[in-house]
From Swiss-Prot:
Its main location: cytoplasm. Substrate binds at residues 33, 57, 79, 140. One of its GO terms (molecular function) is magnesium ion binding. Catalyzes the specific phosphorylation of the 3-hydroxyl group of shikimic acid using ATP as a cosubstrate. Mg(2+) binds at residue 15. This is Shikimate kinase. It catalyses: shikimate + ATP = 3-phosphoshikimate + ADP + H(+). It comes from Parabacteroides distasonis (strain ATCC 8503 / DSM 20701 / CIP 104284 / JCM 5825 / NCTC 11152). Monomer. Pathway: Metabolic intermediate biosynthesis; chorismate biosynthesis; chorismate from D-erythrose 4-phosphate and phosphoenolpyruvate: step 5/7.
Amino acid sequence: MKRVFLVGYMGAGKTTVGKELAKLAGLSFIDLDYYIEGRYHKAVSQIFAERGEEAFREIERNMLHEVAEFEDVLISTGGGAPCFFDNMEFMNASGTTVYLKVSVEELAKRLELCKHTRPVLKGRSGEELRAFIAESLEKRNPFYTKASITFDAEKMLTESDVHDISNALMKIL
């Protein structure tokens, strides 16, 4: 029985690497945000807007506890999931946690391309986006760094890079 939790900031590649790594490891893949959306029949951004962050974080915690009961699974968490309640400690006690670490500069490049699909980033670009990421990451890093494994996911430009990162993680897990 194996459980792996991927943590890291939005844009770090948790879903992209997670799918590939799960395939290589013979594990089921669950993206926690998509799991929540499937259960609530609403986008995470809509749940956030309608119920507020506190209610969303409670839903997220409950769904995290639910999927952590599954066996032979790789779970990609939302960027904020490790930072609320005792979620990080819970994940560490339930399986192997892997922090996909990416620099502020690289995250800003990646997120600039998809800022229109991420409500918290709308209207931010350039230096404002970079400053927002830096501030958020500084608050979240104390949680992320509690992961069992920290992995540098800075260079993930091509499908081949994703495959290489997944293969490297397979050797660690």
